[in-house]
Design a protein with these regions (language model features):
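Extracellular and secretory-pathway beta-repeat/beta-biased strand scaffolds
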Residues: 1-248
Length: 248
């Protein structure tokens, strides 16, 4: 019996990517690339980092959403400031080699038909925000325009109201990143239900938190849990497989 798992419904999914206005003149812009693909342009560039902010972020079945990757950008951070779960039912990609971070404190679902088309590493988290050393934060729960956040991220911040459950991540998808890259799923309960995760020569980092806390990030996007952080369950069911060797 699996208890305490946050179950999300795929019914009545609004397949929509809607930028918010928290970045002002640097707001994200969604352009139709072709009949089945949207391109996300704009955003706020700070050194090697590109920041996007959305009221809602979903990828519908049989569609693709790709982030533009400007020159010199090595990390793309995408936060959801609205109140809805992100349903990734199609292809989520990057037009370049930047690492992609998807941040939605409400929860994230990867449906059976979801896939990644990235050349870098990928991280999905229900954290409230990401810390950049002493430079500051990029927060989904207290959104503002990013200041001088030019360094690599240093920690995921879970600042939910005390005694309020941290929302989870569910995947039924085959999710892959290229050779030597890493894939991170970090939230409350992590449920991999018939999912297939492939990171040939890289790492899979799965982390579940039961309470508020800070999870540090190393220079390879690896997770560093403090001993006093209460951990939540991670479920791998219905033939879920995780492959880091490059062999099947």
């Amino acid at each position: 019996t699996v208890s305490g798992i946050l179950i999300f419904s795929h019914n009545q999914v609004l397949a929509q990517v809607t930028p918010d206005n928290t970045l002002g003149d640097e707001s994200s812009v969604v352009n139709l690339r072709d009949a089945t693909t949207d391109s996300i342009d704009g955003g706020a560039i700070r050194g090697q980092n590109l920041f996007h902010s959305f009221e809602e972020f979903n990828v519908s079945e049989d569609r693709g959403v790709y982030f533009a990757n400007p020159d010199a950008v090595t990390n793309i951070f995408s936060r959801v400031t609205g109140n809805d779960v992100s349903n990734i039912l199609g292809t989520l990609g990057v037009d370049g080699a930047a690492n992609l971070f998807l941040i939605n404190p409400n929860g994230i679902i990867f449906g059976e038909g979801a896939s990644l088309d990235v050349q870098g590493s990928f991280a999905a988290t229900t954290a409230d925000g990401i810390q950049f050393g002493k430079q500051g934060f990029f927060s989904a729960s207290n959104p503002e325009s990013p200041k001088l956040l030019t360094i690599n991220p240093s920690a995921y911040l879970f600042n939910q109201i005390e005694n309020q459950a941290i929302n989870g991540i569910e995947s039924k998808a085959a999710l892959s990143v290229p050779k030597g890259e890493n894939l991170v799923l970090l939230g409350g309960n992590i449920l991999l239900n018939g999912s297939e995760i492939n990171t040939p020569g890289g790492r899979v980092e799965l982390g579940g938190l039961a309470t508020t806390g800070k999870i540090e990030i190393d220079n390879t996007l690896g997770l560093k849990f403090a001993q006093n952080v209460a951990k939540e369950d991670i479920f791998l069911i219905n033939g879920t497989s995780i492959n880091t060797s490059g062999e099947k």
